[in-house]
Amino acid sequence: KTYRKYHFHVWKTLVVNFKLLPFKQAIHLPIVIYGKTQLIISNSSVKLLCSPRFGIVKFAKNHEYFYPTPAPSLLFMINGTMVLEGDVQFSSGCTLRINDGILQLGENVCFSGGCKILCNNRIFIRAYSQFAFDCVCCDTNFHYILQKDGLVKDCVGIIEVGNRNWIGNSTTLMRGTQLPDNTIVASRSFVNKSFLGYHDDGILIAGSPGKVVRLGDQRVFSAQKEMEIRAFFKKSKMTEMWLAESDFFFYE
């Protein structure tokens, strides 16, 4: 049952922590399970690169209400490792599936409702990156393909997402994806290659397959700046653009 004061599942939270973490870390309950979550865990572990404390990972907590509460969520770890550098949030309806793989998440990474993270090899998502609802991050094709020349390529690869990335809703990141810092991926895009050759401070990727459509764009991550910009447009309804000051910060 749900513990009414904090609205998390006490029993599932205890099971996950003491199955995945050393005892001295598990007693802090760094992983908190919310909502209607199915647990499938075997021979797996979580490694903390930060000090253990309550609620570093909030799994299936509905914080933006793109999905109803409780939407079914899945935490599946078999022979898997999750490395955590700081706070991470998975909203309701998310699937986290690590099977013979390593998933490393930077500080303040956030997955909105319905996201699927499928890791069979290696996925590394750096700090402050955010995934909008219904995104898929998958480092495997699951099945092998026999080519005309008789060769068969490996079906697994790696995915690397840089710092402060914003992945639009319903986007798919497949094996081979490498995104630099301050990247925006437009909604419903499909990405499966490296964009690390771009040295501009911010790129915008869109389409299927994903292509760079604009350089120099960055998501405004600062909540304070977003409030200022929103207030400006509410007051100046006839104005289409807001001009940033020279000392403007995209994130804080």
What spans do the regions from the language model cover?
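Flexible glycine-rich beta->alpha loop in the catalytic core of nucleotide-sugar glycosyltransferases
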Residues: 143, 189-190, 196-197
